[in-house]
Amino acid sequence: MERKGSAAGAKGNPSPPAAGEGQRPPPPLCVPGGGGGAPARGQVGAAAEPAELIRRAHEFKSQGAQCYKDKKFREAIGKYHRALLELKGLLPPPGERERDSRPASPAGALKPGRLSEEQSKTVEAIEIDCYNSLAACLLQAELVNYERVKEYCLKVLKKEGENFKALYRSGVAFYHLGDYDKALYYLKEARTQQPTDTNVIRYIQLTEMKLSRCSQREKEAM
């Protein structure tokens, strides 16, 4: 899934999401049953090098993309979770990240297990793609878990505040959860990214109608 794109893909929208949403490189074929070809992190031990963990995470993410294209959404969700599991613990908390950005020596050598700047960016990009893709998969369910969609989208926005798809889907999730003020906020933020997107415009109109009705009921109750 590209991190910029149309709002198509939310439940009930006029048009479905683009296949393979959330992935950059052409993915390999999905292996049914969750095997994936890459060993689970625990199978090789905690001493695996960051580069190997990142490689495996990217492989699982790519397999998830293929599963999404094949409309195997449950399998895709499993692949994206496996990708995130590979990356778990690689990035330090935000406070420590600033300290880690300083060179470990005058030569700028990295301590064992510490990520390079390029690796850190790669890890964050994979995490963003996986969370966006998980939200896209959940929105294909017959009964959508909008609370979980919201959770994944907010994780993306914490890392990349102007991510269009996460902004739009956050708005959709808040709309269906009945929090129309927050829905309108995120939808308007999405509109600043793509002012002509028809799905964003439609959900803004729906949200404003809900807010208007709520306001009218409050006046009648006074």
Swiss-Prot record:
InterPro entries tied to this protein: FKBP4/5/8-like, TPR-like_helical_dom_sf, TPR_2, TPR_rpt
Keywords: Phosphoprotein, Repeat, TPR repeat
Matching PROSITE patterns: TPR, TPR_REGION
The keyword Transferase is assigned to this record: no
Record-listed Phosphoserine modification sites: 105
GO biological process: bone development
Pfam families, A to Z: TPR_2 (PF07719)
Intervals holding TPR repeats: 56-89, 125-160, 161-194
Record region (Disordered): 1-49, 88-116
Origin: domain of life: Eukaryota
PANTHER family: PEPTIDYLPROLYL ISOMERASE, TETRATRICOPEPTIDE REPEAT DOMAIN 9
Family in the record: Belongs to the TTC9 family.
Name of the protein: Tetratricopeptide repeat protein 9A
Gene transcribed to yield this protein: TTC9
